[in-house]
Amino acid sequence: MSISRREFLGSAAAALAAGAPVESYRPNLLPSQKEVWDWQVWMAKLGPKYTGNPAHVQFVDFLAAQLKSAGLEVARERYTFPRWEARRWELSIAPASEKPFRAPVTSYFPYSGQTPASGVTGELVFAGSNPSFRLDQLHGKIALIDFACNVRKFGEIYEPWGIHPADAAFPTSIRPARGAVNDLTQFQKAGAVGVVLAWTDVSDANAADQYTPFSRPPQNIPGLYVGRETGARLRSLASPLASGGAKATLILEAQTFPDSPTDTLIATLAGASDESIIVNTHTDGTNATEENGGIGIVALARYFSRIPKSERKRTLVFPLTTGHFAGPWVPSIRGVITKYPELIKKTVAAVTVEHLGCREWMDGASFRYRATGENEWSVAITETKSTAQALLEALHGSASRRTAVVNPVHGGWLGEGASLTRAGIPTIGYIPQPNYLLAAPADGCIEKLSAELMYSQIQDFAKTIHILDRIPAIELKKS
């Protein structure tokens, strides 16, 4: 089911979306699409940028250099934390009545635990399906569990301010490929020596390399994921369902780096007044889109730095934070809010930029993972009518098709914009949610992104910031 055009809320926003183009926007001042895409391709080749790893450090240094070269004042905030990094993972099964075999592993549970090079071995026991687990009789054994991905019920939590294009059908729910079990400590406390988590409702190609869940504290028990068919086979061999049972050897070699440094950047472009607009993202992530918001911000910073200060009513502040993938230790945008209360008081609006250029990839009925030929839905979350209207006006004539500007009336704030909203700032949180968001293949999912879409989205943000800059602060806060 989908929300039809007749069900859209905010008729005034729809009228704005049909209005004139943003006159203050100067496309010739924006870095070219080729330049932006070249940055994107370079970034993807770095590999996963898990918080504080060498690729992430290199990316943050690149962003800082680009922002400084555009004339912005760039400050760094350093954090340290115990960085965990997986080195090698493997799962071997020795059934009582079959030949031993190596089970294909789709990925590992981040910050779960680690084993010696020889792994840990124990009887494979099926401990249930999420969320109902049987924790008795797991001592010294390897727990096998399975799960279905959680549904995000857009139709229940969001009310659209408007949709671009207006005749597009915004889905009432999605089920992105995300691990649904966020805590393994219950199995560790029950005495298990390892956990195997089996996907049940996505293809193996979709499940491959998923770094999920992220931002969890150490679990103190190693966990590996297997695909749908492998999970079904293991379940048929595991106790108590199988008469003879099977032994499993789970290997997850990992290393922890205590006191690993990681930096947040705060770049400032002074305007004609002390009032500020925050444009933020995070810099750590798994692939080419998670997180490429920093590339978008570099393009935006270069664009606005080429406009005379006298024509920029407000100061632009660009926090590019670390810690999105290390939440137990590093506060990401919450750290900026806590440390700079005067900035927050002077900020009249915020735009959070995440996950640019996403094209839609879905599992078909036969579990064939493929491109649909459409853009991924971009969900722009905002609680205030003024910010919603600003984005809808910016979207007029945009190539960023399948954008939903929504009011989170029943929750559903996702991403780095949530904390800014809680701090009382009218915020637009732009957050596409593709299946591959947390996947970390060698190519960084670059083939799933569109240079044209990414560039169009950056243009939309530039126009939105222009519009926000001209709206009085008192009007921006009106719901």
Listing of model-derived features with the role each one plays in the protein:
Residues 7-23:
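N-terminal export signals
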